[in-house]
Amino acid sequence: MSTTTPIVDFVRRYAQSGTSRLHMPGHKGQSLLGFEPWDITEIKGADELYGADGIIAQSEANATRLFGTVHTYYSTEGSSQCIRAMLCLALQAAPAAGQRPVLLAARNAHKALLYAAALLDFDIQWLWPAPQDAGALCSCPVSAAKLTGALQGLAQQGKRPFGVYITSPDYLGGVQDIAALAEVCKDFGVPLLVDNAHGAYLRFLPQGGQHPIALGAAMCCDSGHKTLPVVTGGAYLHLGKNAPIQDEAAVRNALALFGSTSPSYLILQSLDKCNQVLSEGYPLRLLQCCGHLTRLRRELNEAAAAKHCPGPLALESEPLKVTLDAAALGMTGTELAEALRCAKVECEYADPRYVVLMFTPANPPQDFERLTSAVLHIVENLTGPFPLPEKNDRELLELEHELHTCCSIRQAVFAPQEQVPTEQAVGRICAMPTVSCPPAIPIVVSGEKITPAAVRLMQKYHVMQAAVLRKTI
């Protein structure tokens, strides 16, 4: 059954009414780029995002039903806003402990987590990948056993984290066992918070059981704009039945704390219209897209195997990503990305080893064919053999062993700082996380000492400048 679009309908009626726009925004609905007639502000009847009781509330109710959550809230400032609000809510709900609040988090977190820690002033204890899993900056598999051990270790120190924070799917398409981690969190009475920015579509796979809320997460964020037909900036904050705070006013206040007082009605209309798309056959189109990608990966891997490539080319990943191991072709990820670019294929992300390509049902058949043709052309012209490098990232392992925290994240972020060349940063204290976006995953965290391994890793990922404290704390 098709879902209503109350925000879109209101704005279209207003745009067609001929009303004199003696209110913001300044373009007055006159077309410059084409969208201006539908760009409005909080006029009468338009509702208000952080105090919604009209058309926005109706639209969010539609999204809540579609995502199967206790309550779904809109964000016009991406998952970054939702991450900060989610952490704020978990912090508010945590029992008073008489000590600094601590979050247990997988190390491959987006830098939005660090900004939240700086603004909310909490500490982070990191979950690092096991040595055999330390293959890339973007990945940090966390097993139920590892999480249990970390929570037990904190308990022995008299500490109880206000939340466990996991990124899934990660930038390379890796997926955590959310159901198992949720059970561990339940046993310890700690909410599981999931950065599901790359996985909004998971709800609409068969049975909808792969979405974090369905798997037991207390709260999660989804970037609608990453994998659903939503314009950039459109995102969701989802609350599950285990969310520590369910009060609507508290949630909207947390979102308002980190959001603009002028949310984009263009983005709100996009989120609203997306509800209708999701209700009109989207799951079938999604399933067909995933099937095409399964066949695409198989074809690429069969071609690579026929040329005796030293390892799989298309890695196992979440359904809508194609993650290519360029080392299987004797190339770097950036070299492979450039070769694809010459074939009119633009990737989402490339690093020294991997190339990530993101598909959705909105991609036409030409896109699948073009990628397949471009990669097969490269495979057919290989002149190997060549060795496959180890998957373990030595610098990442050394980074954990050399870790030394000198001050809190908040102290570092708000302290006087300066930029220095990366090679001159050894021994200095990291101020702001320095890493490109994508993937926006910090190599060194604010407040940590920059070590030789950190410098090597920054250089590997082409980070040439580091923000450091001017003085030692």
Go through each PLM region and give its residues.
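Conserved C-terminal alpha-helix-loop-beta "cap" of PLP-dependent enzymes
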Residues: N301-P452, L457-V463
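Conserved PLP-enzyme active-site core in the AAT-like
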Residues: T4-R12, G78-P310
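Short, glycine-/Ser/Thr-/acidic-enriched flexible segments
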Residues: G29, Y171, H225-T227, N242-P244, ...
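Short active-site oxyanion
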Residues: V70-T72, Q99-L103, I443
